[in-house]
Amino acid sequence: MTTWNKCLKKLKKSLSTFEYKTWIKPIHVEQNNYLFTIYCNNEYFKKHIKSKYGEIISSTIQEFHDGDLLIEYSNKKFSGEKSPEVTSVGPQANFFNQKNVEIKDDSEETSLNQEPKKSQKKLSSKNSASQELFGFDEAMLITDKDDQEYSFGLPLKEKYVFDSFVVGDANKIARAAAMQVSINPGKLHNPLFIYGGSGLGKTHLMQAIGNHAREVNPNARIIYTNSEQFIKDYVNSIRLQDQDEFQRVYRSADILLIDDIQFIAGKEGTAQEFFHTFNALYENGKQIILTSDKYPNEIEGLEERLVSRFGYGLTVSVDMPDLETRIAILLKKAHDLGQKLPNETAAFIAENVRTNVRELEGALNRVLTTSKFNHKDPTIEVAQACLRDVIKIQEKKVKIDNIQKVVADFYRIRVKDLTSNQRSRNIARPRQIAMSLARELTSHSLPEIGNAFGGRDHTTVMHAVKAITKLRQSNTSISDDYELLLDKISR
C-alpha cells in the first residue's frame, strides 16, 4: 500500500463522508520520493483545500512518510495515470517541527521552520477563492459541531432555534409550517414563503429551519443566505467567468434559504439566475424557503413567473405579536439572560413598544442594563426613566373612543355605526378591527370593551379578536390596514 493510500484510509475515518467525497476524493496526489504534488483541478479548489484541510493532510502524510517532505499544491489537472484514489486537501499547515517539511504551491514556498511570509498570510486570510467568488470564507460555512460537515452560505446562528421562538396568534401558523419543512424538506409546503414587517421573527424562523433540519439530517446540504449576498455572488461569478461554479454550489443544496428575496426585484440577470436555480431545486424535490417584507404579488418589479412559482407552496405571514405575546417574549428573553423581570415591568414595556420584536428586545436590554448598573430592580419607574428617549410614553392611555374615531375615519363610516346593531360587512369588519385594537392597546377587560361597543357580550369581543388575528394571517389587505391603524393610534 502506498503512502498516500495509507493517508486516504486515515483521512476517510477522520473526516465526515460529505467532506471526504466533496473535497478529498476529487483530487489527485503524485508522490516522487519526498515530493507530494497535490493536483486540485482549479484555483478555487486549491485555495479552499489549502486553507481548510492543509494541516490535517500535512500531519497525516508525516505520520506515514519517513524523512524530509515537500508538499506542493497545484491548480492544474492531473495529467498522468490516475492513482487508485487520490486526493488533496488542506489549509496551509500549522506545521510540526519533527521533520523538515515544506509546503509549496504554484506561486510560493514556505518552510515549516520559518516565519510565514507575507504572501502566506495573504493566502490563509479571507482572500481565498471561495471568498472572492462567493463572498464567504471558512468562518462563514455552516458547521455542525459533531461531524464538521459544511454547506456554503452565511452562518446559521445557534440562538435561532424553535425553542427560543415565542409563539402567539400572530405567528403560530408560520412557526408550524417552518417546523414541518425542517422535518420533511421538499415534501410539503415547497416553497415556504414567509412575509411580514421588519423585526417580527422571519429570520429567526428561517434559521431555526436550517438548524433543526441539520439536527434531523446532519448530511443535508443547507445553504442559508440573503438576497444581497446572492446578488453579490452572481455578479462575482460573472466577473470571474465562473458561473458554472456558482450554479453548482447553489443548485447542489438540499435546502435553500434566502432572506429578503424582494431585493432581487428589478435585477434582471440575478432574477433570471434565481429563476433557473429555483426550477432546478424544485424539480429535484429540494426545499426552498424564502422571506420577504411583502406578499409576493405586492413586491414591486418582481417578475410574474417568480410570483407564480412562489405560489407553488405555502405563503404565511408573521405579524406584530399581540400584547400577551409581547409580554411572554420579554419574560422569556429576561429568563434566558438570567435576569428577573417583574410582570408589571414587562407589561409596561410591551404596552409602549409596539413596532417590532427587535425593538422590544432592545428596550428590554436597556432596562435590564440600566437597573444592573444602578444596582436597582427593573421596576416600572426604572423602565420609564431609561426608555423616555426610546418610546414616547403617552401622557394618557389610549382610550377606546379614540380608537373608534380613528377606525371610523379610516373606513369612512360613523362612530355610531361601530356601536350600532348593523351587521353589514362594511360595518362589521371595521367593528371587529376596532375591538381587536382596543384589546391590544388598552388595559380594559373584555366586558368593558364589549360595553363600549353598544353593550356587546365579552364573547363577541373574543370572537372579533380571533377573527382579525386569523384574517391578518391570510389577508394582506386586512393586515396592512391593521398595521396602519396601529401606527395612527400609537402616535
Swiss-Prot record:
MF GO annotations: ATP binding; ATP hydrolysis activity; DNA replication origin binding; lipid binding
Subcellular location: Cytoplasm
Positions of the UniProt region annotated as Domain III, AAA+ region: 155-371
Pfam families: Bac_DnaA, Bac_DnaA_C, DnaA_N
Annotated keywords: ATP-binding, Cytoplasm, DNA replication, DNA-binding, Lipid-binding, Nucleotide-binding
Region Domain IV, binds dsDNA: start-end pairs: 372-491
One GO CC term, this protein: cytoplasm
Family as reported in the entry's similarity comment: Belongs to the DnaA family.
HAMAP family for this protein: DnaA_bact
Chain's role: Plays an essential role in the initiation and regulation of chromosomal replication. ATP-DnaA binds to the origin of replication (oriC) to initiate formation of the DNA replication initiation complex once per cell cycle. Binds the DnaA box (a 9 base pair repeat at the origin) and separates the double-stranded (ds)DNA. Forms a right-handed helical filament on oriC DNA; dsDNA binds to the exterior of the filament while single-stranded (ss)DNA is stabiized in the filament's interior.
Protein name: Chromosomal replication initiator protein DnaA
